[in-house]
């Protein structure tokens, strides 16, 4: 499989502007790891789309290649009827010389809101994602397979629905139970 074939398996069929693969995308291609090129952000950080089945393997490879810090994990809703997105911002943390910039990459897993909202937990790789994954579950309903504490973090355990989804309808009334 060549570089074009690997990245094109997850690309959209629209004919928008051609996105050039960055160094991290090229490295993943050399490793045979399939991903989708997304437009870099305004400061040039690579954004890559990843299948849920490939996420753990790709992040494991990145961690072994120096991306040893999960700066942020979260989720967002693209809108009613559109995808729910689980994202990861990985960085390389080391001793830098003056003027050096850390390597950074963002991975995004696009999930059909009416399909399986399951991604593998990265807790085994980055223990700091414990509460971040729980918050993403609590607010968007994305399940993290293999997470050691898969329960709500912010909302009461008996809360119905996912408050940060754009199609969420807030209940008129919710009775809080005493914690005593």
Curated annotation (Swiss-Prot):
Keywords: Membrane, NAD, NADP, Plastoquinone, Quinone, Thylakoid, Translocase, Transport
Keyword Lipid metabolism: no
UniProt feature, compositional bias: Polar residues: 1-16
General function of this protein: NDH-1 shuttles electrons from an unknown electron donor, via FMN and iron-sulfur (Fe-S) centers, to quinones in the respiratory and/or the photosynthetic chain. The immediate electron acceptor for the enzyme in this species is believed to be plastoquinone. Couples the redox reaction to proton translocation, and thus conserves the redox energy in a proton gradient. Cyanobacterial NDH-1 also plays a role in inorganic carbon-concentration.
PANTHER family per UniProt: NADH DEHYDROGENASE [UBIQUINONE] IRON-SULFUR PROTEIN 3, MITOCHONDRIAL, NADH DEHYDROGENASE UBIQUINONE IRON-SULFUR PROTEIN 3
Cross-referenced NCBIfam families: PRK12494.1
Protein name from the UniProt record: NAD(P)H-quinone oxidoreductase subunit J
Name of the gene: ndhJ
């Amino acid at each position: 499989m060549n570089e074009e074939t690997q990245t094109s398996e997850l690309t959209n069929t629209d004919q928008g502007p051609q996105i050039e693969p960055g160094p991290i995308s090229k490295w993943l291609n050399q490793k045979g790891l399939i991903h989708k090129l997304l437009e870099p952000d305004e400061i040039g950080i690579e954004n890559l789309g990843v299948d849920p089945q490939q996420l753990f393997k790709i992040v494991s490879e990145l961690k072994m290649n120096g991306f040893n810090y999960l700066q942020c994990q979260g989720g967002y809703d693209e809108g009613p009827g559109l995808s729910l997105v689980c994202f990861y911002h990985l960085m390389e943390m080391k001793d830098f010389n003056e003027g050096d910039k850390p390597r950074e990459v963002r991975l995004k897993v696009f999930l059909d809101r009416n399909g399986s909202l399951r991604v593998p937990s990265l807790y085994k790789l980055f223990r700091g994602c414990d509460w971040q994954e729980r918050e993403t579950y609590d607010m968007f309903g994305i399940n993290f397979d293999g997470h050691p504490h898969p329960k709500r973090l912010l909302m009461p355990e008996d809360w119905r629905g996912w408050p940060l989804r754009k199609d969420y309808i807030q209940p008129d009334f919710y009775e809080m139970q005493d914690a005593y």
